[in-house]
Amino acid sequence: MAKTACTVPITQIILDEEIYPRNNVSPKRVSMLAENMRDGFEIDPIEVQIHPEYDDKYRILDGAHRWHAYKEIGATEIPVHIITLDGLDPLLYAAKKAIGPLQLTEDEARTTARRAYENNSRLTSFEIGQAIGRSRQAVDAYIADLRATFQMDLDLKILRMNGLHIPQERMANRFGVLQQTISIHLQKMPELAKLVNTDLSKGFTVPQVAEKHGWPEPMVWSLALEGKDDLERFKALNWGLRTWDLWNWNDCDRRFGDDWPGRIPAQMIAHILYYFSDQNDLVFDPMAGGGVVADTCFAFNRKCWSFDMADRPDTRPEIEPCFWDITDLKWPIKGKTKPDLIIFDPPYFKKQSNNYDPDGISGMSKANYLKFLKSFFALAHSNAKKSTQMVFINADWRDFQNTPAKNETRVNSILINDYLWILNQSGWQETHIFQAPLSSERFKANVVSAMQKKKIIGVTSRYVIILKKK
Protein backbone atom coordinates (compact mmCIF):
# COMPACT_ATOMS: atom_id res chain seq x y z
CA MET A 1 0.00 0.00 0.00
CA ALA A 2 1.45 3.36 -1.08
CA LYS A 3 0.80 6.86 0.27
CA THR A 4 1.42 10.15 -1.58
CA ALA A 5 1.15 13.52 0.20
CA CYS A 6 -0.10 16.50 -1.80
CA THR A 7 -2.63 19.34 -1.92
CA VAL A 8 -5.74 19.09 -4.11
CA PRO A 9 -8.75 21.35 -4.83
CA ILE A 10 -11.57 20.57 -2.42
CA THR A 11 -14.00 20.40 -5.37
CA GLN A 12 -12.18 17.28 -6.62
CA ILE A 13 -12.95 15.34 -3.43
CA ILE A 14 -16.13 13.26 -3.11
CA LEU A 15 -17.74 11.57 -0.12
CA ASP A 16 -18.81 8.26 -1.66
CA GLU A 17 -21.64 6.72 0.37
CA GLU A 18 -20.74 3.30 -1.07
CA ILE A 19 -17.56 3.18 1.01
CA TYR A 20 -18.55 5.41 3.96
CA PRO A 21 -19.20 3.20 7.00
CA ARG A 22 -21.13 5.76 9.07
CA ASN A 23 -24.86 6.37 8.82
CA ASN A 24 -24.32 10.12 8.90
CA VAL A 25 -21.84 12.90 9.59
CA SER A 26 -21.92 14.56 13.03
CA PRO A 27 -22.57 18.34 12.67
CA LYS A 28 -21.23 18.87 16.20
CA ARG A 29 -17.91 17.23 15.35
CA VAL A 30 -17.66 19.16 12.08
CA SER A 31 -18.17 22.47 13.92
CA MET A 32 -15.53 21.54 16.50
CA LEU A 33 -13.00 20.69 13.79
CA ALA A 34 -13.79 23.90 11.89
CA GLU A 35 -13.18 25.94 15.04
CA ASN A 36 -9.84 24.17 15.59
CA MET A 37 -8.86 24.94 12.00
CA ARG A 38 -9.65 28.64 12.47
CA ASP A 39 -7.57 28.64 15.66
CA GLY A 40 -4.58 27.24 13.76
CA PHE A 41 -4.49 23.73 15.16
CA GLU A 42 -2.65 21.22 12.98
CA ILE A 43 -5.09 18.77 11.37
CA ASP A 44 -4.13 15.39 9.92
CA PRO A 45 -4.45 15.21 6.12
CA ILE A 46 -7.54 13.51 4.70
CA GLU A 47 -6.93 10.08 3.19
CA VAL A 48 -8.35 9.63 -0.31
CA GLN A 49 -8.03 7.30 -3.27
CA ILE A 50 -8.38 8.06 -6.97
CA HIS A 51 -12.04 7.58 -7.82
CA PRO A 52 -12.50 4.33 -9.80
CA GLU A 53 -14.89 6.00 -12.25
CA TYR A 54 -13.50 9.55 -12.54
CA ASP A 55 -9.78 10.12 -13.12
CA ASP A 56 -9.97 13.76 -11.99
CA LYS A 57 -11.78 13.00 -8.71
CA TYR A 58 -10.85 11.49 -5.35
CA ARG A 59 -13.08 9.72 -2.86
CA ILE A 60 -12.60 9.89 0.90
CA LEU A 61 -11.24 6.87 2.75
CA ASP A 62 -10.74 8.67 6.06
CA GLY A 63 -11.61 12.22 7.10
CA ALA A 64 -15.22 12.94 6.12
CA HIS A 65 -15.67 15.27 9.13
CA ARG A 66 -12.43 17.11 8.33
CA TRP A 67 -13.55 17.53 4.71
CA HIS A 68 -16.86 19.06 5.83
CA ALA A 69 -14.97 21.31 8.25
CA TYR A 70 -12.67 22.55 5.48
CA LYS A 71 -15.76 23.35 3.41
CA GLU A 72 -17.26 25.21 6.39
CA ILE A 73 -14.23 27.52 6.70
CA GLY A 74 -14.15 28.14 2.94
CA ALA A 75 -10.94 26.29 2.09
CA THR A 76 -10.35 25.81 -1.63
CA GLU A 77 -7.37 23.46 -1.44
CA ILE A 78 -6.64 20.94 1.31
CA PRO A 79 -3.79 18.57 2.23
CA VAL A 80 -4.43 14.90 1.47
CA HIS A 81 -2.71 11.55 1.41
CA ILE A 82 -3.53 9.68 -1.79
CA ILE A 83 -3.68 6.00 -0.87
CA THR A 84 -3.10 3.09 -3.25
CA LEU A 85 -4.92 0.16 -1.65
CA ASP A 86 -3.34 -2.63 -3.73
CA GLY A 87 -6.44 -4.80 -3.65
CA LEU A 88 -7.61 -3.98 -0.11
CA ASP A 89 -11.36 -3.47 0.16
CA PRO A 90 -11.96 0.33 0.34
CA LEU A 91 -15.07 -0.04 2.50
CA LEU A 92 -13.26 -2.16 5.09
CA TYR A 93 -10.24 0.14 5.01
CA ALA A 94 -12.53 3.12 5.65
CA ALA A 95 -14.31 1.22 8.44
CA LYS A 96 -11.04 0.36 10.18
CA LYS A 97 -10.03 4.01 10.06
CA ALA A 98 -13.45 5.14 11.30
CA ILE A 99 -13.38 3.03 14.50
CA GLY A 100 -10.18 4.74 15.67
CA PRO A 101 -11.90 7.76 17.23
CA LEU A 102 -15.33 6.14 17.73
CA GLN A 103 -16.63 2.58 17.38
CA LEU A 104 -19.27 1.89 14.75
CA THR A 105 -22.80 1.57 16.08
CA GLU A 106 -24.43 -1.85 15.88
CA ASP A 107 -26.44 -0.76 12.84
CA GLU A 108 -23.35 0.70 11.14
CA ALA A 109 -21.31 -2.45 11.84
CA ARG A 110 -24.03 -4.73 10.49
CA THR A 111 -24.60 -2.61 7.38
CA THR A 112 -20.87 -2.33 6.66
CA ALA A 113 -20.34 -6.08 7.10
CA ARG A 114 -23.18 -6.90 4.71
CA ARG A 115 -22.06 -4.37 2.11
CA ALA A 116 -18.49 -5.67 2.27
CA TYR A 117 -19.62 -9.28 1.80
CA GLU A 118 -21.95 -8.34 -1.05
CA ASN A 119 -19.03 -6.58 -2.76
CA ASN A 120 -16.64 -9.47 -2.21
CA SER A 121 -18.00 -12.83 -1.08
CA ARG A 122 -14.46 -14.17 -0.71
CA LEU A 123 -13.94 -12.09 2.45
CA THR A 124 -13.91 -14.14 5.65
CA SER A 125 -15.83 -13.20 8.78
CA PHE A 126 -12.47 -12.71 10.52
CA GLU A 127 -11.29 -10.19 7.89
CA ILE A 128 -14.55 -8.24 8.07
CA GLY A 129 -14.58 -8.37 11.86
CA GLN A 130 -11.06 -6.97 12.13
CA ALA A 131 -12.07 -3.96 10.05
CA ILE A 132 -15.34 -3.14 11.81
CA GLY A 133 -14.31 -4.01 15.36
CA ARG A 134 -16.55 -7.03 15.81
CA SER A 135 -16.00 -10.72 16.56
CA ARG A 136 -16.10 -13.41 13.90
CA GLN A 137 -19.26 -14.80 15.48
CA ALA A 138 -20.95 -11.40 15.27
CA VAL A 139 -20.06 -11.09 11.60
CA ASP A 140 -21.34 -14.63 10.96
CA ALA A 141 -24.71 -13.53 12.33
CA TYR A 142 -24.70 -10.31 10.27
CA ILE A 143 -24.15 -12.10 6.95
CA ALA A 144 -25.70 -15.55 7.51
CA ASP A 145 -28.51 -15.06 4.98
CA LEU A 146 -26.19 -13.50 2.39
CA ARG A 147 -23.74 -16.36 2.76
CA ALA A 148 -26.51 -18.94 2.29
CA THR A 149 -27.73 -17.15 -0.84
CA PHE A 150 -24.18 -16.96 -2.17
CA GLN A 151 -23.61 -20.67 -1.57
CA MET A 152 -26.82 -21.54 -3.43
CA ASP A 153 -25.81 -19.25 -6.28
CA LEU A 154 -22.34 -20.82 -6.40
CA ASP A 155 -23.90 -24.30 -6.41
CA LEU A 156 -25.94 -23.38 -9.47
CA LYS A 157 -22.96 -21.85 -11.29
CA ILE A 158 -20.83 -24.92 -10.61
CA LEU A 159 -23.68 -27.18 -11.74
CA ARG A 160 -23.93 -25.13 -14.92
CA MET A 161 -20.22 -25.45 -15.73
CA ASN A 162 -20.08 -29.09 -14.68
CA GLY A 163 -23.02 -29.88 -16.95
CA LEU A 164 -20.93 -28.73 -19.90
CA HIS A 165 -17.91 -30.73 -18.64
CA ILE A 166 -15.67 -27.77 -17.89
CA PRO A 167 -12.73 -29.08 -15.78
CA GLN A 168 -12.70 -28.41 -12.04
CA GLU A 169 -9.40 -26.55 -12.29
CA ARG A 170 -10.96 -23.98 -14.62
CA MET A 171 -14.07 -23.73 -12.41
CA ALA A 172 -11.88 -22.98 -9.41
CA ASN A 173 -10.02 -20.32 -11.37
CA ARG A 174 -13.32 -18.85 -12.58
CA PHE A 175 -14.70 -18.39 -9.06
CA GLY A 176 -11.42 -17.66 -7.29
CA VAL A 177 -11.75 -20.64 -4.94
CA LEU A 178 -9.73 -23.76 -4.20
CA GLN A 179 -10.33 -26.80 -6.40
CA GLN A 180 -11.20 -28.64 -3.18
CA THR A 181 -14.09 -26.20 -2.72
CA ILE A 182 -15.40 -27.12 -6.17
CA SER A 183 -15.20 -30.82 -5.28
CA ILE A 184 -17.21 -30.22 -2.10
CA HIS A 185 -19.90 -28.34 -4.01
CA LEU A 186 -20.06 -31.06 -6.68
CA GLN A 187 -21.09 -33.54 -4.02
CA LYS A 188 -24.37 -31.61 -3.73
CA MET A 189 -25.16 -31.85 -7.44
CA PRO A 190 -27.12 -35.13 -7.37
CA GLU A 191 -29.45 -33.75 -4.70
CA LEU A 192 -30.04 -30.53 -6.68
CA ALA A 193 -30.84 -32.56 -9.80
CA LYS A 194 -33.13 -34.84 -7.79
CA LEU A 195 -35.28 -31.89 -6.69
CA VAL A 196 -35.72 -30.76 -10.29
CA ASN A 197 -36.38 -34.28 -11.58
CA THR A 198 -39.02 -34.78 -8.90
CA ASP A 199 -40.99 -31.77 -10.13
CA LEU A 200 -40.60 -32.86 -13.75
CA SER A 201 -41.93 -36.31 -12.86
CA LYS A 202 -45.00 -34.65 -11.33
CA GLY A 203 -45.88 -33.17 -14.71
CA PHE A 204 -44.67 -29.63 -14.22
CA THR A 205 -43.46 -28.02 -17.45
CA VAL A 206 -39.83 -27.12 -18.03
CA PRO A 207 -40.52 -23.35 -17.76
CA GLN A 208 -42.42 -23.89 -14.49
CA VAL A 209 -39.62 -25.96 -12.98
CA ALA A 210 -36.96 -23.49 -14.16
CA GLU A 211 -38.81 -20.60 -12.53
CA LYS A 212 -39.42 -22.49 -9.28
CA HIS A 213 -35.80 -23.52 -8.78
CA GLY A 214 -34.14 -20.48 -10.35
CA TRP A 215 -32.45 -22.58 -13.02
CA PRO A 216 -31.80 -21.43 -16.59
CA GLU A 217 -34.31 -23.23 -18.82
CA PRO A 218 -31.66 -25.04 -20.94
CA MET A 219 -30.31 -26.71 -17.78
CA VAL A 220 -33.76 -28.03 -16.96
CA TRP A 221 -34.09 -29.30 -20.53
CA SER A 222 -30.84 -31.24 -20.06
CA LEU A 223 -32.54 -33.22 -17.28
CA ALA A 224 -35.94 -33.45 -18.94
CA LEU A 225 -34.37 -34.93 -22.09
CA GLU A 226 -31.92 -37.24 -20.35
CA GLY A 227 -31.63 -40.62 -22.06
CA LYS A 228 -33.32 -39.46 -25.28
CA ASP A 229 -31.71 -39.54 -28.72
CA ASP A 230 -31.34 -36.41 -30.83
CA LEU A 231 -34.51 -36.97 -32.86
CA GLU A 232 -36.53 -37.28 -29.67
CA ARG A 233 -34.97 -34.05 -28.44
CA PHE A 234 -35.99 -32.23 -31.63
CA LYS A 235 -39.54 -33.46 -31.14
CA ALA A 236 -39.66 -32.49 -27.46
CA LEU A 237 -38.46 -28.98 -28.30
CA ASN A 238 -41.07 -28.73 -31.07
CA TRP A 239 -38.43 -28.20 -33.74
CA GLY A 240 -38.73 -29.72 -37.18
CA LEU A 241 -35.63 -31.31 -38.68
CA ARG A 242 -34.49 -29.97 -42.07
CA THR A 243 -32.96 -32.52 -44.42
CA TRP A 244 -31.85 -30.07 -47.09
CA ASP A 245 -29.24 -27.33 -47.35
CA LEU A 246 -31.55 -24.33 -46.85
CA TRP A 247 -31.85 -23.49 -43.16
CA ASN A 248 -34.08 -20.51 -42.63
CA TRP A 249 -36.04 -19.62 -39.50
CA ASN A 250 -38.28 -16.64 -38.96
CA ASP A 251 -37.03 -16.03 -35.44
CA CYS A 252 -34.67 -17.22 -32.72
CA ASP A 253 -36.01 -19.55 -30.03
CA ARG A 254 -35.99 -17.27 -26.98
CA ARG A 255 -35.50 -20.23 -24.63
CA PHE A 256 -31.86 -20.47 -25.71
CA GLY A 257 -29.28 -17.70 -25.51
CA ASP A 258 -29.47 -14.13 -24.30
CA ASP A 259 -30.72 -11.07 -26.13
CA TRP A 260 -27.49 -10.29 -27.96
CA PRO A 261 -26.34 -8.47 -31.12
CA GLY A 262 -26.18 -10.90 -34.02
CA ARG A 263 -27.98 -13.64 -32.08
CA ILE A 264 -28.24 -16.87 -34.07
CA PRO A 265 -31.16 -19.33 -33.93
CA ALA A 266 -30.73 -22.24 -31.54
CA GLN A 267 -32.49 -24.32 -34.19
CA MET A 268 -29.49 -23.76 -36.48
CA ILE A 269 -27.05 -24.89 -33.79
CA ALA A 270 -29.22 -27.95 -33.11
CA HIS A 271 -29.03 -28.91 -36.79
CA ILE A 272 -25.25 -28.51 -36.75
CA LEU A 273 -25.00 -30.69 -33.65
CA TYR A 274 -27.32 -33.33 -35.12
CA TYR A 275 -25.54 -33.73 -38.44
CA PHE A 276 -21.93 -33.12 -37.46
CA SER A 277 -21.51 -34.36 -33.89
CA ASP A 278 -22.63 -37.08 -31.51
CA GLN A 279 -23.83 -36.97 -27.93
CA ASN A 280 -20.99 -36.40 -25.42
CA ASP A 281 -18.78 -34.80 -28.09
CA LEU A 282 -16.82 -31.71 -27.08
CA VAL A 283 -17.90 -28.51 -28.83
CA PHE A 284 -15.63 -25.45 -28.81
CA ASP A 285 -17.22 -21.98 -29.17
CA PRO A 286 -14.52 -19.29 -29.43
CA MET A 287 -16.86 -16.27 -29.69
CA ALA A 288 -19.84 -17.25 -27.59
CA GLY A 289 -21.71 -13.94 -27.42
CA GLY A 290 -25.13 -14.59 -25.89
CA GLY A 291 -24.49 -18.27 -25.21
CA VAL A 292 -26.77 -19.91 -27.78
CA VAL A 293 -24.26 -22.68 -28.50
CA ALA A 294 -23.76 -23.57 -24.82
CA ASP A 295 -27.50 -23.55 -24.14
CA THR A 296 -28.23 -25.78 -27.12
CA CYS A 297 -25.44 -28.15 -26.09
CA PHE A 298 -27.22 -28.52 -22.74
CA ALA A 299 -30.37 -29.64 -24.52
CA PHE A 300 -28.50 -32.01 -26.85
CA ASN A 301 -26.09 -33.59 -24.36
CA ARG A 302 -22.89 -32.14 -25.79
CA LYS A 303 -19.92 -30.95 -23.81
CA CYS A 304 -19.19 -27.29 -24.53
CA TRP A 305 -16.31 -24.94 -23.81
CA SER A 306 -17.22 -21.33 -24.59
CA PHE A 307 -15.17 -18.14 -24.63
CA ASP A 308 -15.87 -14.46 -25.24
CA MET A 309 -14.31 -11.06 -24.63
CA ALA A 310 -17.42 -9.99 -22.69
CA ASP A 311 -16.91 -11.43 -19.20
CA ARG A 312 -20.19 -12.10 -17.35
CA PRO A 313 -19.29 -14.36 -14.42
CA ASP A 314 -22.56 -13.75 -12.58
CA THR A 315 -24.94 -14.52 -15.43
CA ARG A 316 -22.78 -16.62 -17.77
CA PRO A 317 -20.06 -18.35 -15.73
CA GLU A 318 -19.71 -21.05 -18.38
CA ILE A 319 -18.50 -18.48 -20.94
CA GLU A 320 -14.89 -17.94 -19.93
CA PRO A 321 -13.17 -14.62 -20.69
CA CYS A 322 -10.91 -14.52 -23.73
CA PHE A 323 -9.68 -11.65 -25.90
CA TRP A 324 -8.39 -12.72 -29.29
CA ASP A 325 -5.39 -10.41 -29.77
CA ILE A 326 -4.48 -10.26 -33.46
CA THR A 327 -0.88 -9.36 -32.52
CA ASP A 328 -0.47 -12.38 -30.25
CA LEU A 329 -3.13 -14.97 -31.05
CA LYS A 330 -3.23 -17.80 -28.49
CA TRP A 331 -5.50 -20.80 -27.95
CA PRO A 332 -7.33 -20.14 -24.66
CA ILE A 333 -6.96 -23.63 -23.18
CA LYS A 334 -3.98 -25.84 -22.47
CA GLY A 335 -3.78 -29.59 -22.25
CA LYS A 336 -4.25 -32.58 -24.49
CA THR A 337 -8.04 -32.39 -24.82
CA LYS A 338 -9.07 -31.21 -28.28
CA PRO A 339 -12.58 -30.48 -29.55
CA ASP A 340 -14.63 -32.72 -31.78
CA LEU A 341 -16.43 -29.73 -33.27
CA ILE A 342 -15.57 -26.02 -33.47
CA ILE A 343 -18.49 -23.64 -34.04
CA PHE A 344 -17.08 -20.27 -35.04
CA ASP A 345 -19.68 -17.50 -35.38
CA PRO A 346 -17.73 -14.21 -35.35
CA PRO A 347 -19.15 -10.73 -36.01
CA TYR A 348 -20.00 -10.48 -39.70
CA PHE A 349 -17.43 -7.75 -40.42
CA LYS A 350 -19.21 -4.38 -40.01
CA LYS A 351 -22.72 -5.78 -39.49
CA GLN A 352 -23.88 -4.80 -35.99
CA SER A 353 -20.53 -3.02 -35.41
CA ASN A 354 -22.31 -0.25 -33.51
CA ASN A 355 -23.47 -2.85 -30.98
CA TYR A 356 -20.09 -4.53 -30.49
CA ASP A 357 -17.02 -3.54 -28.51
CA PRO A 358 -14.90 -1.21 -30.71
CA ASP A 359 -11.81 -3.20 -29.69
CA GLY A 360 -13.31 -6.35 -31.20
CA ILE A 361 -12.81 -7.61 -34.74
CA SER A 362 -15.86 -5.74 -36.07
CA GLY A 363 -13.84 -2.56 -35.55
CA MET A 364 -11.06 -3.74 -37.88
CA SER A 365 -10.38 -2.75 -41.45
CA LYS A 366 -11.24 -5.26 -44.16
CA ALA A 367 -7.58 -6.29 -44.49
CA ASN A 368 -7.12 -6.80 -40.75
CA TYR A 369 -10.43 -8.63 -40.42
CA LEU A 370 -9.42 -11.15 -43.08
CA LYS A 371 -5.92 -11.35 -41.60
CA PHE A 372 -7.40 -12.17 -38.21
CA LEU A 373 -9.64 -14.88 -39.65
CA LYS A 374 -6.73 -16.48 -41.50
CA SER A 375 -4.64 -16.50 -38.31
CA PHE A 376 -7.53 -17.94 -36.31
CA PHE A 377 -8.20 -20.68 -38.86
CA ALA A 378 -4.52 -21.68 -38.76
CA LEU A 379 -4.51 -21.66 -34.95
CA ALA A 380 -7.68 -23.75 -34.83
CA HIS A 381 -6.14 -26.20 -37.29
CA SER A 382 -3.09 -26.71 -35.06
CA ASN A 383 -5.29 -27.24 -31.99
CA ALA A 384 -7.72 -29.68 -33.60
CA LYS A 385 -7.71 -33.44 -33.89
CA LYS A 386 -7.46 -35.09 -37.29
CA SER A 387 -11.18 -35.84 -37.06
CA THR A 388 -12.22 -32.40 -35.79
CA GLN A 389 -14.71 -30.55 -37.94
CA MET A 390 -15.14 -26.80 -37.96
CA VAL A 391 -18.30 -24.83 -38.64
CA PHE A 392 -17.79 -21.28 -39.88
CA ILE A 393 -20.85 -19.03 -39.90
CA ASN A 394 -20.68 -15.72 -41.72
CA ALA A 395 -22.44 -13.53 -44.25
CA ASP A 396 -21.58 -11.62 -47.38
CA TRP A 397 -20.58 -8.03 -46.77
CA ARG A 398 -21.26 -5.55 -49.54
CA ASP A 399 -21.02 -1.80 -49.22
CA PHE A 400 -24.42 -1.29 -50.84
CA GLN A 401 -25.58 1.77 -48.89
CA ASN A 402 -26.84 4.40 -51.35
CA THR A 403 -25.13 2.55 -54.20
CA PRO A 404 -27.09 1.20 -57.19
CA ALA A 405 -26.25 -2.45 -57.85
CA LYS A 406 -24.56 -1.79 -61.20
CA ASN A 407 -22.19 0.72 -59.55
CA GLU A 408 -20.99 -1.57 -56.76
CA THR A 409 -17.34 -2.65 -56.73
CA ARG A 410 -15.38 -5.35 -54.88
CA VAL A 411 -13.12 -2.84 -53.14
CA ASN A 412 -14.87 -2.97 -49.77
CA SER A 413 -16.88 -6.18 -50.07
CA ILE A 414 -16.18 -9.57 -48.51
CA LEU A 415 -17.91 -12.51 -50.19
CA ILE A 416 -18.02 -16.23 -49.58
CA ASN A 417 -15.17 -16.93 -51.99
CA ASP A 418 -12.90 -14.70 -49.86
CA TYR A 419 -13.67 -16.83 -46.81
CA LEU A 420 -13.25 -20.10 -48.69
CA TRP A 421 -9.87 -19.01 -50.04
CA ILE A 422 -8.38 -18.22 -46.62
CA LEU A 423 -9.93 -21.36 -45.13
CA ASN A 424 -8.22 -23.47 -47.78
CA GLN A 425 -4.97 -21.56 -47.26
CA SER A 426 -5.20 -22.43 -43.54
CA GLY A 427 -5.52 -26.18 -44.04
CA TRP A 428 -9.32 -26.58 -44.06
CA GLN A 429 -11.51 -28.09 -46.79
CA GLU A 430 -15.22 -27.37 -47.05
CA THR A 431 -17.60 -30.33 -47.26
CA HIS A 432 -20.99 -28.60 -47.04
CA ILE A 433 -22.29 -25.07 -47.51
CA PHE A 434 -25.74 -24.33 -46.09
CA GLN A 435 -27.79 -21.26 -46.88
CA ALA A 436 -29.04 -19.73 -43.61
CA PRO A 437 -30.50 -16.35 -44.62
CA LEU A 438 -30.59 -13.40 -42.27
CA SER A 439 -33.99 -11.96 -41.52
CA SER A 440 -35.21 -9.38 -44.02
CA GLU A 441 -37.42 -7.72 -41.38
CA ARG A 442 -34.85 -4.94 -40.90
CA PHE A 443 -35.75 -3.76 -44.41
CA LYS A 444 -38.90 -1.78 -43.56
CA ALA A 445 -41.44 -0.86 -46.24
CA ASN A 446 -40.14 2.69 -46.68
CA VAL A 447 -36.55 1.43 -46.89
CA VAL A 448 -37.49 -1.20 -49.47
CA SER A 449 -39.31 1.41 -51.52
CA ALA A 450 -36.26 3.69 -51.53
CA MET A 451 -33.97 0.78 -52.45
CA GLN A 452 -36.24 -0.19 -55.32
CA LYS A 453 -36.21 3.33 -56.73
CA LYS A 454 -32.41 3.55 -56.49
CA LYS A 455 -31.89 -0.04 -57.73
CA ILE A 456 -30.05 -1.05 -54.55
CA ILE A 457 -29.61 -4.72 -53.63
CA GLY A 458 -29.41 -5.49 -49.90
CA VAL A 459 -27.78 -8.48 -48.21
CA THR A 460 -29.60 -11.30 -46.44
CA SER A 461 -27.26 -14.13 -47.39
CA ARG A 462 -25.57 -16.05 -44.58
CA TYR A 463 -23.59 -19.26 -44.87
CA VAL A 464 -22.93 -22.20 -42.60
CA ILE A 465 -19.72 -23.72 -43.94
CA ILE A 466 -18.74 -27.19 -42.70
CA LEU A 467 -15.02 -28.00 -42.90
CA LYS A 468 -12.60 -30.83 -42.30
CA LYS A 469 -8.83 -30.76 -41.96
CA LYS A 470 -7.06 -31.43 -45.24
Task: Please state what every model-predicted region is.
Residues 5, 62, 119-121, 163, ...:
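Helix-turn-helix/winged-helix DNA-binding modules
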Residues 7-18, 91-94, 246-252, 351-358:
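Short, basic/glycine-rich phosphate-binding loops at helix/coil junctions
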Residues 17-34, 68-164, 189:
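Amphipathic, charge-rich alpha-helical segments that serve as recognition/docking helices
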Residues 54-56, 152, 461:
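Exposed loop/turn and edge beta-strand positions of beta-sandwich/beta-sheet ligand-binding modules
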Residues 158-176, 181-470:
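Class I S-adenosyl-L-methionine-dependent methyltransferase catalytic core
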